[in-house]
From Swiss-Prot:
Primary site of residence: cytoplasm
E.C. code: 2.1.2.11
Gene behind the chain: panB
Cell cycle in keyword set: no
Protein name: 3-methyl-2-oxobutanoate hydroxymethyltransferase
Complexes and interactors: Homodecamer; pentamer of dimers.
Catalytic activity: 3-methyl-2-oxobutanoate + (6R)-5,10-methylene-5,6,7,8-tetrahydrofolate + H2O = 2-dehydropantoate + (6S)-5,6,7,8-tetrahydrofolate
Cofactor, free-text remark: Binds 1 Mg(2+) ion per subunit.
Protein task: Catalyzes the reversible reaction in which hydroxymethyl group from 5,10-methylenetetrahydrofolate is transferred onto alpha-ketoisovalerate to form ketopantoate.
Amino acid sequence: MTIHKAVKRITASEIRSRKGQEPIVSLTAYQAYSARIADPYCDLLLVGDSVGMVVHGFETTLPVSLDMMILHGQAVMRGSKRALVVVDMPFGSYEESPEQAFSNASRILAETGCSAVKLEGGVYIAETIDFLCKRGIPVMSHVGLTPQAVNRFGGFKTQGRNESNWQQIEADAAAIEKAGAFAVVVEGVVEPLAVKLTQMLSIPTIGIGASSQCDGQILVMEDMLGYGTWVPKFVRRYGVLEQEMEKAIKSYADDVKSRTFPSDEEIYKLKQKSG
């Protein structure tokens, strides 16, 4: 009898213990197939509300619903075995009260099987993070450029360009650490501030457009694979998959029009009559 050894999934506490150790490798994932490919190489897969912009074509993350996040969270859990899967709580699903946040976060964990959620914000959301953590829901937070606050920021703008603005971001990071978050995404802040946050916090910082000195890095998978024409400054492209996809689709279209697809080897034929 063949015995299959179960793969142990990384936990939130294990991610927290990686502070100052080997950098944490993270990517976004929205589908089972991409999660399956990324899983052996990533410590953490984030089912980000960026799915609204990347997959569904929204201009911001604001229209993303809780049901959408659960659907994509289920897909990523089915595709992965090893990485810690964290699901974003979408705009409007946690800001009203800690009780609202717990109701929706517990639904995410129960219906997807994931092990943690991510909330944007700092000081103002610390009470909610504390409420969730004390009730058994691991929380990763997100400071700096927080996409759900796009209207308040007036767009997707780098934070901390003036040192006079650092104090609020530092206060946000300290508040979510005290509240019990196991890690924090630091997005779109100037490099010296990202380094300072990494040094002052006892929990891992996971950078995106921040600093190589963060405790880990995360990118939108489609960005680093080479989909789309606009490339943010902080993205390094490791592939050109959009061009490859277009090339393949064009070849398919040409073959269909020329009737060279399907070929004899790609169609089913009648069985030969015996006798």
